[in-house]
From Swiss-Prot:
Major place of residence: cytoplasm
UniProt EC number: 6.1.1.19
Entry's localization field: Cytoplasm
GO terms, molecular function: arginine-tRNA ligase activity; ATP binding
PROSITE patterns in the record: AA_TRNA_LIGASE_I (PS00178)
Summary of subunit composition and partner proteins: Monomer.
Protein name: Arginine--tRNA ligase
Motif 'HIGH' region, residue range(s) on this chain: 132-142
Family annotation (InterPro entries): aa-tRNA-synth_I_CS, Arg-tRNA-ligase, Arg-tRNA-synth_N, Arg-tRNA-synth_N_sf, ArgRS_core, DALR_anticod-bd, Rossmann-like_a/b/a_fold, tRNAsynth_Ia_anticodon-bd
Source organism of this protein record: Listeria welshimeri serovar 6b (strain ATCC 35897 / DSM 20650 / CCUG 15529 / CIP 8149 / NCTC 11857 / SLCC 5334 / V8)
Length: 556
Protein backbone atom coordinates (compact mmCIF):
# COMPACT_ATOMS: atom_id res chain seq x y z
CA UNK A 1 0.00 0.00 0.00
CA UNK A 2 1.45 3.38 -0.98
CA UNK A 3 1.36 6.72 0.81
CA UNK A 4 -1.58 7.98 -1.25
CA UNK A 5 -3.67 4.91 -0.48
CA UNK A 6 -2.79 5.07 3.21
CA UNK A 7 -3.90 8.69 3.36
CA UNK A 8 -7.13 7.91 1.54
CA UNK A 9 -7.88 5.28 4.18
CA UNK A 10 -7.04 7.76 6.95
CA UNK A 11 -9.27 10.39 5.35
CA UNK A 12 -12.18 7.97 4.95
CA UNK A 13 -11.87 6.93 8.59
CA UNK A 14 -11.77 10.58 9.66
CA UNK A 15 -14.92 11.31 7.63
CA UNK A 16 -16.65 8.31 9.18
CA UNK A 17 -15.88 9.51 12.72
CA UNK A 18 -17.05 13.02 11.82
CA UNK A 19 -20.36 11.58 10.57
CA UNK A 20 -20.78 9.59 13.80
CA UNK A 21 -20.26 12.76 15.85
CA UNK A 22 -22.25 15.16 13.67
CA UNK A 23 -25.20 12.98 12.66
CA UNK A 24 -25.33 10.61 15.62
CA UNK A 25 -25.26 7.43 13.55
CA UNK A 26 -23.63 4.28 14.94
CA UNK A 27 -20.40 3.60 13.08
CA UNK A 28 -21.77 0.37 11.56
CA UNK A 29 -24.65 2.30 9.96
CA UNK A 30 -22.48 4.86 8.20
CA UNK A 31 -22.74 4.15 4.44
CA UNK A 32 -19.64 3.40 2.38
CA UNK A 33 -17.69 6.60 1.96
CA UNK A 34 -16.51 7.24 -1.58
CA UNK A 35 -13.71 9.64 -2.42
CA UNK A 36 -13.38 11.11 -5.88
CA UNK A 37 -10.58 13.21 -7.34
CA UNK A 38 -12.13 16.39 -8.82
CA UNK A 39 -11.31 17.03 -12.47
CA UNK A 40 -10.46 20.63 -11.60
CA UNK A 41 -7.86 20.88 -8.83
CA UNK A 42 -9.49 24.17 -7.75
CA UNK A 43 -12.17 21.94 -6.21
CA UNK A 44 -9.71 20.20 -3.92
CA UNK A 45 -7.69 17.01 -3.79
CA UNK A 46 -10.70 14.85 -2.94
CA UNK A 47 -14.46 15.18 -2.82
CA UNK A 48 -17.20 13.11 -1.18
CA UNK A 49 -20.98 12.98 -1.51
CA UNK A 50 -21.52 11.44 1.95
CA UNK A 51 -23.92 14.24 2.94
CA UNK A 52 -26.21 13.31 0.05
CA UNK A 53 -26.04 9.64 1.00
CA UNK A 54 -27.18 10.55 4.53
CA UNK A 55 -30.09 12.80 3.54
CA UNK A 56 -32.78 10.13 3.81
CA UNK A 57 -31.51 8.73 7.12
CA UNK A 58 -30.90 12.12 8.73
CA UNK A 59 -34.08 13.61 7.22
CA UNK A 60 -32.23 16.82 6.42
CA UNK A 61 -31.04 18.59 3.29
CA UNK A 62 -27.58 17.39 2.16
CA UNK A 63 -26.05 20.84 2.50
CA UNK A 64 -27.35 21.13 6.07
CA UNK A 65 -25.79 17.76 6.88
CA UNK A 66 -22.51 18.84 5.28
CA UNK A 67 -22.50 21.99 7.40
CA UNK A 68 -22.73 19.86 10.54
CA UNK A 69 -19.97 17.47 9.40
CA UNK A 70 -17.38 20.06 8.34
CA UNK A 71 -16.60 21.39 11.86
CA UNK A 72 -15.93 17.83 13.00
CA UNK A 73 -13.65 17.28 10.01
CA UNK A 74 -11.57 20.30 10.94
CA UNK A 75 -10.81 18.95 14.39
CA UNK A 76 -7.38 17.45 15.05
CA UNK A 77 -6.34 16.28 11.60
CA UNK A 78 -2.92 17.22 10.27
CA UNK A 79 -3.71 15.74 6.87
CA UNK A 80 -6.47 18.23 6.02
CA UNK A 81 -5.51 21.79 5.17
CA UNK A 82 -9.00 23.06 4.29
CA UNK A 83 -12.56 21.77 3.87
CA UNK A 84 -15.35 23.44 1.92
CA UNK A 85 -18.92 22.68 0.91
CA UNK A 86 -19.81 22.89 -2.77
CA UNK A 87 -23.12 22.84 -4.61
CA UNK A 88 -25.96 20.87 -3.02
CA UNK A 89 -23.71 19.27 -0.40
CA UNK A 90 -20.44 17.98 -1.80
CA UNK A 91 -17.57 18.19 0.67
CA UNK A 92 -14.23 19.10 -0.90
CA UNK A 93 -10.92 18.46 0.84
CA UNK A 94 -7.65 20.30 0.38
CA UNK A 95 -4.85 18.27 1.90
CA UNK A 96 -1.67 19.52 3.50
CA UNK A 97 0.85 18.94 0.73
CA UNK A 98 3.57 18.01 3.20
CA UNK A 99 2.38 14.39 3.15
CA UNK A 100 3.26 14.16 -0.54
CA UNK A 101 6.96 14.37 0.16
CA UNK A 102 6.71 11.02 1.96
CA UNK A 103 6.32 9.47 -1.50
CA UNK A 104 9.88 10.18 -2.57
CA UNK A 105 11.79 7.72 -0.34
CA UNK A 106 9.04 5.13 -0.92
CA UNK A 107 9.41 5.29 -4.71
CA UNK A 108 13.20 5.30 -4.48
CA UNK A 109 13.07 2.17 -2.33
CA UNK A 110 10.49 0.28 -4.38
CA UNK A 111 12.13 1.24 -7.70
CA UNK A 112 11.09 -1.37 -10.32
CA UNK A 113 8.31 -2.56 -8.01
CA UNK A 114 6.73 0.88 -7.67
CA UNK A 115 3.14 0.61 -8.87
CA UNK A 116 2.64 -2.95 -7.63
CA UNK A 117 -0.38 -3.72 -5.44
CA UNK A 118 -2.42 -6.65 -4.17
CA UNK A 119 -5.55 -5.36 -5.91
CA UNK A 120 -5.98 -8.63 -7.83
CA UNK A 121 -5.43 -10.78 -4.73
CA UNK A 122 -3.77 -13.50 -6.81
CA UNK A 123 -6.89 -14.33 -8.83
CA UNK A 124 -5.88 -16.57 -11.74
CA UNK A 125 -6.49 -15.10 -15.19
CA UNK A 126 -5.58 -16.47 -18.56
CA UNK A 127 -5.26 -14.06 -21.47
CA UNK A 128 -5.37 -15.66 -24.90
CA UNK A 129 -4.43 -13.28 -27.68
CA UNK A 130 -3.12 -12.98 -31.25
CA UNK A 131 -3.74 -16.70 -32.07
CA UNK A 132 -3.27 -16.00 -35.78
CA UNK A 133 -3.43 -18.92 -38.18
CA UNK A 134 0.09 -20.25 -38.83
CA UNK A 135 -0.23 -19.63 -42.55
CA UNK A 136 1.30 -16.20 -43.13
CA UNK A 137 2.45 -12.90 -41.72
CA UNK A 138 0.88 -11.04 -38.81
CA UNK A 139 -1.31 -8.19 -40.02
CA UNK A 140 -2.17 -4.89 -38.33
CA UNK A 141 -5.11 -6.32 -36.39
CA UNK A 142 -2.84 -9.01 -34.97
CA UNK A 143 -0.27 -6.34 -34.08
CA UNK A 144 -2.83 -4.25 -32.24
CA UNK A 145 -4.10 -7.34 -30.42
CA UNK A 146 -0.54 -8.31 -29.50
CA UNK A 147 0.23 -4.86 -28.10
CA UNK A 148 -2.99 -4.66 -26.10
CA UNK A 149 -2.89 -8.27 -24.88
CA UNK A 150 0.71 -8.09 -23.73
CA UNK A 151 0.23 -4.69 -22.08
CA UNK A 152 -2.90 -5.89 -20.30
CA UNK A 153 -1.06 -8.96 -19.00
CA UNK A 154 1.77 -6.75 -17.70
CA UNK A 155 -0.67 -4.35 -16.05
CA UNK A 156 -2.76 -7.07 -14.41
CA UNK A 157 0.37 -8.77 -13.11
CA UNK A 158 1.56 -5.51 -11.54
CA UNK A 159 -1.89 -5.08 -9.99
CA UNK A 160 -1.64 -8.41 -8.19
CA UNK A 161 -3.35 -10.85 -10.55
CA UNK A 162 -1.86 -14.23 -11.40
CA UNK A 163 -1.70 -13.99 -15.19
CA UNK A 164 -0.88 -16.55 -17.87
CA UNK A 165 -0.50 -15.63 -21.56
CA UNK A 166 -1.53 -18.13 -24.21
CA UNK A 167 -1.38 -18.44 -27.98
CA UNK A 168 -3.85 -20.89 -29.55
CA UNK A 169 -2.33 -22.45 -32.65
CA UNK A 170 -5.08 -23.18 -35.18
CA UNK A 171 -3.25 -26.16 -36.67
CA UNK A 172 -6.13 -28.55 -37.37
CA UNK A 173 -8.31 -26.89 -40.01
CA UNK A 174 -8.52 -26.75 -43.79
CA UNK A 175 -6.12 -23.81 -43.86
CA UNK A 176 -3.36 -26.15 -42.64
CA UNK A 177 -4.19 -28.67 -45.35
CA UNK A 178 -3.84 -25.85 -47.89
CA UNK A 179 -0.54 -24.84 -46.31
CA UNK A 180 0.81 -28.39 -46.64
CA UNK A 181 -0.36 -28.69 -50.26
CA UNK A 182 1.26 -25.33 -51.03
CA UNK A 183 4.54 -26.43 -49.42
CA UNK A 184 4.38 -29.69 -51.36
CA UNK A 185 3.94 -27.84 -54.67
CA UNK A 186 6.86 -25.52 -53.89
CA UNK A 187 8.97 -28.55 -52.90
CA UNK A 188 8.47 -30.12 -56.33
CA UNK A 189 9.10 -26.75 -57.96
CA UNK A 190 12.39 -26.36 -56.04
CA UNK A 191 13.45 -29.75 -57.41
CA UNK A 192 12.64 -28.65 -60.96
CA UNK A 193 9.57 -30.87 -61.17
CA UNK A 194 6.12 -29.90 -62.38
CA UNK A 195 3.32 -29.75 -59.82
CA UNK A 196 -0.17 -28.32 -59.87
CA UNK A 197 -0.51 -25.52 -57.33
CA UNK A 198 -3.63 -25.83 -55.12
CA UNK A 199 -6.47 -23.47 -56.00
CA UNK A 200 -6.72 -22.15 -52.43
CA UNK A 201 -2.99 -22.36 -51.79
CA UNK A 202 -0.71 -19.79 -50.21
CA UNK A 203 1.40 -17.99 -52.78
CA UNK A 204 3.62 -15.88 -50.55
CA UNK A 205 7.40 -15.70 -50.85
CA UNK A 206 7.67 -17.45 -47.50
CA UNK A 207 6.09 -20.61 -48.97
CA UNK A 208 8.57 -20.55 -51.85
CA UNK A 209 11.32 -20.34 -49.23
CA UNK A 210 9.73 -23.22 -47.32
CA UNK A 211 9.68 -25.35 -50.48
CA UNK A 212 13.38 -24.71 -51.02
CA UNK A 213 14.08 -25.63 -47.39
CA UNK A 214 12.23 -28.91 -47.83
CA UNK A 215 14.14 -29.67 -51.01
CA UNK A 216 17.45 -28.90 -49.30
CA UNK A 217 16.52 -31.01 -46.26
CA UNK A 218 15.07 -34.07 -48.00
CA UNK A 219 16.31 -33.94 -51.58
CA UNK A 220 14.12 -36.18 -53.75
CA UNK A 221 13.32 -38.54 -50.87
CA UNK A 222 9.59 -37.73 -50.94
CA UNK A 223 9.10 -37.42 -54.69
CA UNK A 224 7.90 -40.99 -55.17
CA UNK A 225 6.49 -41.78 -51.73
CA UNK A 226 2.77 -41.88 -51.02
CA UNK A 227 0.94 -38.57 -50.68
CA UNK A 228 -0.06 -39.53 -47.14
CA UNK A 229 3.54 -40.12 -46.02
CA UNK A 230 4.89 -37.04 -47.79
CA UNK A 231 2.19 -34.70 -46.51
CA UNK A 232 2.45 -36.07 -42.98
CA UNK A 233 6.15 -35.14 -42.92
CA UNK A 234 5.66 -31.80 -44.66
CA UNK A 235 2.88 -30.87 -42.24
CA UNK A 236 5.32 -30.99 -39.33
CA UNK A 237 7.92 -28.95 -41.22
CA UNK A 238 5.42 -26.41 -42.52
CA UNK A 239 3.93 -25.79 -39.08
CA UNK A 240 7.36 -25.50 -37.50
CA UNK A 241 8.37 -23.05 -40.22
CA UNK A 242 5.28 -20.85 -39.88
CA UNK A 243 5.04 -20.91 -36.09
CA UNK A 244 8.77 -20.17 -35.94
CA UNK A 245 8.15 -17.04 -38.00
CA UNK A 246 5.29 -16.01 -35.74
CA UNK A 247 7.36 -16.54 -32.60
CA UNK A 248 10.28 -14.55 -34.02
CA UNK A 249 8.07 -11.63 -35.08
CA UNK A 250 6.29 -11.54 -31.73
CA UNK A 251 9.52 -11.76 -29.74
CA UNK A 252 10.87 -8.84 -31.76
CA UNK A 253 7.64 -7.02 -30.82
CA UNK A 254 8.49 -7.76 -27.16
CA UNK A 255 5.56 -10.15 -26.82
CA UNK A 256 6.02 -13.56 -25.23
CA UNK A 257 3.67 -16.35 -24.21
CA UNK A 258 3.64 -18.82 -21.34
CA UNK A 259 1.88 -21.42 -23.46
CA UNK A 260 1.57 -22.18 -27.17
CA UNK A 261 -1.47 -24.48 -27.26
CA UNK A 262 -2.00 -26.69 -30.30
CA UNK A 263 -5.55 -27.28 -31.53
CA UNK A 264 -4.37 -30.66 -32.81
CA UNK A 265 -3.59 -31.70 -29.24
CA UNK A 266 -7.31 -31.56 -28.46
CA UNK A 267 -7.82 -34.45 -30.86
CA UNK A 268 -4.64 -36.31 -29.97
CA UNK A 269 -5.52 -36.19 -26.27
CA UNK A 270 -9.23 -36.96 -26.82
CA UNK A 271 -10.52 -33.66 -25.43
CA UNK A 272 -13.25 -32.94 -27.99
CA UNK A 273 -15.83 -35.70 -27.53
CA UNK A 274 -15.74 -35.54 -23.69
CA UNK A 275 -16.69 -31.86 -23.99
CA UNK A 276 -19.62 -32.85 -26.19
CA UNK A 277 -20.70 -35.54 -23.71
CA UNK A 278 -20.59 -33.07 -20.85
CA UNK A 279 -22.94 -30.78 -22.75
CA UNK A 280 -25.18 -33.76 -23.47
CA UNK A 281 -25.21 -34.82 -19.80
CA UNK A 282 -26.18 -31.26 -18.86
CA UNK A 283 -29.17 -31.51 -21.18
CA UNK A 284 -28.28 -29.01 -23.89
CA UNK A 285 -27.60 -31.30 -26.88
CA UNK A 286 -30.21 -32.46 -29.38
CA UNK A 287 -30.25 -34.09 -32.82
CA UNK A 288 -32.07 -32.55 -35.77
CA UNK A 289 -31.81 -33.02 -39.57
CA UNK A 290 -28.97 -35.48 -39.06
CA UNK A 291 -26.87 -32.87 -37.22
CA UNK A 292 -25.95 -32.43 -33.55
CA UNK A 293 -27.01 -29.10 -32.03
CA UNK A 294 -26.23 -27.11 -28.88
CA UNK A 295 -29.25 -25.34 -27.41
CA UNK A 296 -27.56 -21.95 -26.92
CA UNK A 297 -30.91 -20.15 -27.03
CA UNK A 298 -31.34 -21.28 -23.42
CA UNK A 299 -28.60 -18.73 -22.66
CA UNK A 300 -29.78 -15.74 -24.71
CA UNK A 301 -28.06 -16.62 -27.97
CA UNK A 302 -30.24 -15.69 -30.96
CA UNK A 303 -30.30 -19.25 -32.36
CA UNK A 304 -29.07 -22.75 -31.56
CA UNK A 305 -25.70 -23.81 -32.97
CA UNK A 306 -24.59 -26.88 -34.93
CA UNK A 307 -21.67 -28.78 -33.40
CA UNK A 308 -21.56 -31.80 -35.74
CA UNK A 309 -22.83 -31.44 -39.29
CA UNK A 310 -24.98 -34.05 -41.02
CA UNK A 311 -21.91 -35.38 -42.85
CA UNK A 312 -20.27 -36.13 -39.47
CA UNK A 313 -17.70 -33.33 -39.63
CA UNK A 314 -17.23 -30.91 -36.76
CA UNK A 315 -18.00 -27.22 -36.96
CA UNK A 316 -15.35 -24.83 -35.63
CA UNK A 317 -17.52 -24.31 -32.57
CA UNK A 318 -17.06 -27.79 -31.09
CA UNK A 319 -13.24 -27.76 -30.76
CA UNK A 320 -13.48 -24.16 -29.52
CA UNK A 321 -15.78 -25.35 -26.74
CA UNK A 322 -13.40 -28.20 -25.93
CA UNK A 323 -10.51 -25.72 -25.80
CA UNK A 324 -12.32 -23.41 -23.40
CA UNK A 325 -13.29 -26.35 -21.20
CA UNK A 326 -9.63 -27.37 -21.16
CA UNK A 327 -8.65 -23.86 -20.06
CA UNK A 328 -11.17 -23.81 -17.24
CA UNK A 329 -10.13 -27.29 -16.11
CA UNK A 330 -6.57 -25.99 -15.83
CA UNK A 331 -7.76 -23.91 -12.89
CA UNK A 332 -8.12 -20.40 -14.27
CA UNK A 333 -10.72 -18.30 -12.49
CA UNK A 334 -11.38 -16.07 -15.51
CA UNK A 335 -10.53 -16.38 -19.19
CA UNK A 336 -9.90 -13.27 -21.26
CA UNK A 337 -10.08 -13.86 -25.01
CA UNK A 338 -8.84 -11.07 -27.27
CA UNK A 339 -10.50 -11.46 -30.66
CA UNK A 340 -10.58 -9.61 -33.95
CA UNK A 341 -13.51 -7.43 -34.97
CA UNK A 342 -14.89 -10.17 -37.24
CA UNK A 343 -15.52 -12.38 -34.19
CA UNK A 344 -17.95 -10.04 -32.42
CA UNK A 345 -20.96 -12.20 -33.28
CA UNK A 346 -19.20 -15.23 -31.80
CA UNK A 347 -19.34 -13.89 -28.24
CA UNK A 348 -22.95 -14.85 -27.27
CA UNK A 349 -22.58 -18.46 -28.41
CA UNK A 350 -19.26 -18.94 -26.61
CA UNK A 351 -20.66 -17.47 -23.39
CA UNK A 352 -23.67 -19.76 -23.80
CA UNK A 353 -21.34 -22.75 -24.19
CA UNK A 354 -19.44 -21.80 -21.04
CA UNK A 355 -22.71 -21.72 -19.11
CA UNK A 356 -23.93 -24.96 -20.69
CA UNK A 357 -20.72 -26.63 -19.50
CA UNK A 358 -21.70 -25.66 -15.95
CA UNK A 359 -19.52 -22.60 -15.45
CA UNK A 360 -20.47 -18.98 -14.88
CA UNK A 361 -20.61 -16.88 -18.06
CA UNK A 362 -18.66 -14.29 -16.07
CA UNK A 363 -15.67 -16.61 -16.28
CA UNK A 364 -15.27 -15.62 -19.92
CA UNK A 365 -14.45 -12.06 -20.93
CA UNK A 366 -13.94 -11.07 -24.54
CA UNK A 367 -12.08 -7.98 -25.68
CA UNK A 368 -12.66 -7.06 -29.32
CA UNK A 369 -9.84 -5.50 -31.33
CA UNK A 370 -11.30 -3.10 -33.86
CA UNK A 371 -9.84 -2.35 -37.27
CA UNK A 372 -6.69 -0.35 -37.91
CA UNK A 373 -6.30 2.10 -40.79
CA UNK A 374 -2.89 3.53 -41.63
CA UNK A 375 -2.41 7.13 -42.72
CA UNK A 376 0.66 9.00 -43.88
CA UNK A 377 0.57 12.74 -44.59
CA UNK A 378 -3.21 12.56 -44.37
CA UNK A 379 -3.53 9.85 -47.04
CA UNK A 380 -4.65 6.32 -46.23
CA UNK A 381 -1.96 3.69 -46.77
CA UNK A 382 -3.26 0.33 -47.97
CA UNK A 383 -0.19 -1.32 -49.44
CA UNK A 384 3.36 -1.76 -48.22
CA UNK A 385 5.95 0.29 -50.12
CA UNK A 386 8.36 -2.61 -49.72
CA UNK A 387 6.21 -5.51 -50.90
CA UNK A 388 3.27 -3.94 -52.72
CA UNK A 389 0.97 -6.10 -50.57
CA UNK A 390 -1.07 -5.49 -47.43
CA UNK A 391 0.96 -3.87 -44.67
CA UNK A 392 2.14 -6.40 -42.10
CA UNK A 393 3.21 -5.92 -38.51
CA UNK A 394 6.83 -6.24 -39.58
CA UNK A 395 6.35 -3.58 -42.29
CA UNK A 396 4.91 -1.16 -39.75
CA UNK A 397 7.70 -1.74 -37.24
CA UNK A 398 10.31 -1.16 -39.95
CA UNK A 399 8.54 2.03 -41.02
CA UNK A 400 7.84 3.78 -37.69
CA UNK A 401 9.84 1.81 -35.11
CA UNK A 402 8.97 -0.72 -32.44
CA UNK A 403 8.35 1.74 -29.60
CA UNK A 404 5.98 3.92 -31.61
CA UNK A 405 4.08 0.87 -32.86
CA UNK A 406 3.59 -0.52 -29.35
CA UNK A 407 2.68 2.85 -27.83
CA UNK A 408 0.27 3.96 -30.56
CA UNK A 409 -1.61 0.65 -30.49
CA UNK A 410 -2.08 1.02 -26.73
CA UNK A 411 -3.32 4.62 -26.99
CA UNK A 412 -6.95 3.85 -27.77
CA UNK A 413 -9.53 1.56 -26.25
CA UNK A 414 -9.45 -1.75 -28.12
CA UNK A 415 -13.12 -1.55 -29.11
CA UNK A 416 -12.65 1.70 -31.07
CA UNK A 417 -11.54 1.92 -34.69
CA UNK A 418 -8.02 3.26 -34.99
CA UNK A 419 -6.48 5.62 -37.51
CA UNK A 420 -2.74 5.12 -37.10
CA UNK A 421 -0.90 8.31 -38.12
CA UNK A 422 2.46 7.09 -39.39
CA UNK A 423 3.74 10.62 -39.97
CA UNK A 424 3.05 11.51 -36.34
CA UNK A 425 4.57 8.24 -35.11
CA UNK A 426 7.83 9.06 -36.91
CA UNK A 427 7.90 12.68 -35.75
CA UNK A 428 10.64 13.79 -33.34
CA UNK A 429 8.56 16.50 -31.73
CA UNK A 430 6.41 16.85 -28.64
CA UNK A 431 3.36 16.37 -30.85
CA UNK A 432 4.32 12.69 -31.03
CA UNK A 433 2.87 11.13 -27.84
CA UNK A 434 5.55 8.47 -27.39
CA UNK A 435 8.37 10.91 -28.15
CA UNK A 436 6.90 13.35 -25.60
CA UNK A 437 6.93 10.74 -22.82
CA UNK A 438 10.29 9.20 -23.74
CA UNK A 439 11.87 12.65 -23.97
CA UNK A 440 10.79 13.38 -20.39
CA UNK A 441 12.61 10.22 -19.29
CA UNK A 442 15.70 11.08 -21.35
CA UNK A 443 15.78 14.64 -20.03
CA UNK A 444 15.66 13.40 -16.43
CA UNK A 445 18.46 10.95 -17.20
CA UNK A 446 20.54 13.80 -18.61
CA UNK A 447 20.01 15.93 -15.50
CA UNK A 448 20.93 13.04 -13.23
CA UNK A 449 24.12 12.44 -15.24
CA UNK A 450 25.03 16.12 -14.95
CA UNK A 451 24.41 16.01 -11.21
CA UNK A 452 26.59 12.93 -10.86
CA UNK A 453 29.40 14.65 -12.77
CA UNK A 454 29.23 17.40 -10.15
CA UNK A 455 29.39 14.90 -7.31
CA UNK A 456 25.68 14.80 -6.52
CA UNK A 457 24.03 11.41 -5.99
CA UNK A 458 20.34 10.71 -5.48
CA UNK A 459 19.59 9.91 -1.85
CA UNK A 460 16.55 8.85 0.14
CA UNK A 461 17.74 11.06 2.98
CA UNK A 462 17.35 14.40 1.21
CA UNK A 463 15.26 17.00 3.07
CA UNK A 464 12.04 16.70 1.09
CA UNK A 465 10.35 19.41 3.15
CA UNK A 466 12.29 21.85 0.96
CA UNK A 467 9.98 20.98 -1.92
CA UNK A 468 7.51 23.84 -1.65
CA UNK A 469 6.53 25.04 -5.13
CA UNK A 470 3.18 24.34 -6.76
CA UNK A 471 4.86 22.56 -9.69
CA UNK A 472 6.71 20.26 -7.27
CA UNK A 473 3.51 19.37 -5.45
CA UNK A 474 1.64 18.84 -8.72
CA UNK A 475 4.36 16.44 -9.89
CA UNK A 476 4.23 14.57 -6.58
CA UNK A 477 0.45 14.23 -6.81
CA UNK A 478 0.68 12.63 -10.24
CA UNK A 479 3.47 10.32 -9.05
CA UNK A 480 1.32 9.20 -6.15
CA UNK A 481 -1.53 8.16 -8.44
CA UNK A 482 0.46 5.50 -10.31
CA UNK A 483 -0.51 2.39 -8.33
CA UNK A 484 -4.19 3.39 -8.39
CA UNK A 485 -4.04 4.00 -12.15
CA UNK A 486 -2.43 0.58 -12.69
CA UNK A 487 -5.14 -1.08 -10.59
CA UNK A 488 -7.86 0.81 -12.44
CA UNK A 489 -6.37 -0.09 -15.84
CA UNK A 490 -6.29 -3.73 -14.74
CA UNK A 491 -9.86 -3.67 -13.46
CA UNK A 492 -11.18 -1.96 -16.60
CA UNK A 493 -8.95 -4.04 -18.92
CA UNK A 494 -7.79 -0.69 -20.29
CA UNK A 495 -4.09 -0.27 -21.18
CA UNK A 496 -4.90 3.12 -22.72
CA UNK A 497 -5.32 4.48 -19.19
CA UNK A 498 -1.59 3.92 -18.64
CA UNK A 499 -0.89 5.91 -21.81
CA UNK A 500 -3.05 8.75 -20.55
CA UNK A 501 -1.30 8.66 -17.17
CA UNK A 502 2.17 8.74 -18.73
CA UNK A 503 1.19 11.78 -20.76
CA UNK A 504 -0.03 13.50 -17.57
CA UNK A 505 3.18 12.58 -15.76
CA UNK A 506 5.39 13.84 -18.59
CA UNK A 507 3.39 17.08 -18.65
CA UNK A 508 3.77 17.51 -14.88
CA UNK A 509 7.51 16.92 -15.16
CA UNK A 510 7.97 19.36 -18.06
CA UNK A 511 6.05 22.04 -16.12
CA UNK A 512 8.20 21.41 -13.07
CA UNK A 513 11.39 21.56 -15.15
CA UNK A 514 10.37 24.80 -16.86
CA UNK A 515 9.63 26.54 -13.55
CA UNK A 516 12.31 25.13 -11.23
CA UNK A 517 16.08 25.05 -11.46
CA UNK A 518 17.16 21.53 -10.55
CA UNK A 519 20.94 21.87 -10.39
CA UNK A 520 21.65 24.91 -8.24
CA UNK A 521 25.14 24.64 -6.78
CA UNK A 522 24.42 27.64 -4.56
CA UNK A 523 21.56 25.79 -2.89
CA UNK A 524 22.71 22.21 -2.54
CA UNK A 525 19.98 21.04 -0.14
CA UNK A 526 17.19 22.06 -2.52
CA UNK A 527 19.18 20.61 -5.42
CA UNK A 528 19.48 17.30 -3.57
CA UNK A 529 15.73 17.23 -2.89
CA UNK A 530 14.91 18.00 -6.51
CA UNK A 531 17.30 15.35 -7.80
CA UNK A 532 15.51 12.81 -5.63
CA UNK A 533 12.17 14.09 -6.90
CA UNK A 534 13.05 13.78 -10.58
CA UNK A 535 14.55 10.34 -9.95
CA UNK A 536 11.11 9.21 -8.72
CA UNK A 537 9.60 10.63 -11.92
CA UNK A 538 12.18 8.73 -13.96
CA UNK A 539 11.36 5.49 -12.13
CA UNK A 540 7.63 5.93 -12.65
CA UNK A 541 7.95 6.84 -16.32
CA UNK A 542 10.15 3.79 -16.88
CA UNK A 543 7.76 1.47 -15.02
CA UNK A 544 4.79 2.77 -16.99
CA UNK A 545 6.54 2.46 -20.34
CA UNK A 546 7.67 -1.05 -19.44
CA UNK A 547 4.04 -2.05 -18.87
CA UNK A 548 3.37 -1.04 -22.47
CA UNK A 549 6.42 -2.83 -23.87
CA UNK A 550 8.08 0.49 -24.72
CA UNK A 551 11.70 1.38 -23.98
CA UNK A 552 12.71 4.20 -21.62
CA UNK A 553 15.75 5.77 -23.34
CA UNK A 554 18.55 7.43 -21.38
CA UNK A 555 19.43 9.62 -24.36
CA UNK A 556 17.50 10.95 -27.36
Amino acid sequence: MNVMQENQIKLIEHIKQAVVQAVGLPEVEVPEILLEVPKDKKHGDYSTNIAMQLARVAKKAPRQIAESIVPELKKDNKLIKEVEIAGPGFINFYLDNAYLTELVPVILTEDHKYGESDFGKGEKFQIEFVSANPTGDLHLGHARGAAIGDSLANIMKMAGFDVSREYYINDAGNQINNLVLSAEARYFEALGLESEFPEDGYRGADIISLGKDLAAKYGDKYVNTSEEERRSVFRVDALAFETGKLRADLEEFRVSFDEWFSETSLYEENKVLPALERLRENGYIYEQDGATWLRTTDFEDDKDRVLIKSDGSYTYFLPDIAYHLNKLERGFDVLIDIWGADHHGYIPRMRAAIEALGYSPNQLEVEIIQLVHLFEDGVQVKMSKRTGKSVTMRDLIEEVGLDATRYFFAMRSSDTHMNFDMSLAKSTSNDNPVYYVQYAHARISSILRSGKEQGLEVTKDADMSLLQTEAEYDLLKVLGEFADVVAEAAAKRAPHRIVRYLNDLATAFHRFYNSNKVLDMDNLEVTQARLSLIKTAQITLRNGLTLLGVSAPEKM
